[in-house]
C-alpha cells in the first residue's frame, strides 16, 4: 500500500510529490492506524487562496484535497510523517504519479 502526498501552489507554483510504500515501513501498523482514522469523507472544498499550498493525499481507495489551512490534526501528522521518510520529487502539474 502506498501513500502519496502532492503539494502544489505557493509562490513558485511547484508541484512536489512524496511517496511512501507502507509495506516497507517498520511501523506499518502505526501508519495504517493513522490512515484508517483520517476523516476522508469529511473534507470540504474551500476557495483557493493566493500563494498558499494545496495538498492532495492519496492512499487507495481514498483521496482528499486539502487547502493549507485545512492541514491540521491527523492530516498534518500524516503529511509530516510522509515528508520525514521520503525525498520529494518534482512532477508536472496535474500528474503527481508520473515518474
Give the residues covered by each predicted segment.
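Function-determining sites in protein domains
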Residues: 1-99
Amino acid at each position: 500500500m502506498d501513500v502519496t502526498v502532492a503539494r502544489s501552489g505557493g509562490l513558485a507554483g511547484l508541484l512536489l510529490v512524496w511517496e511512501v510504500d507502507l509495506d516497507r515501513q517498520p511501523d506499518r501498523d502505526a501508519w495504517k492506524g493513522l490512515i484508517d482514522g483520517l476523516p476522508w469523507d469529511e473534507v470540504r472544498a474551500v476557495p483557493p487562496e493566493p500563494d498558499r499550498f494545496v495538498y492532495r493525499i492519496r492512499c487507495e481507495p481514498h483521496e482528499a484535497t486539502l487547502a493549507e489551512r485545512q492541514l491540521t490534526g491527523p492530516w498534518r501528522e500524516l503529511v509530516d510523517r510522509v515528508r520525514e521518510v521520503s525525498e520529494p520529487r518534482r512532477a508536472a502539474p496535474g500528474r503527481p504519479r508520473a515518474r
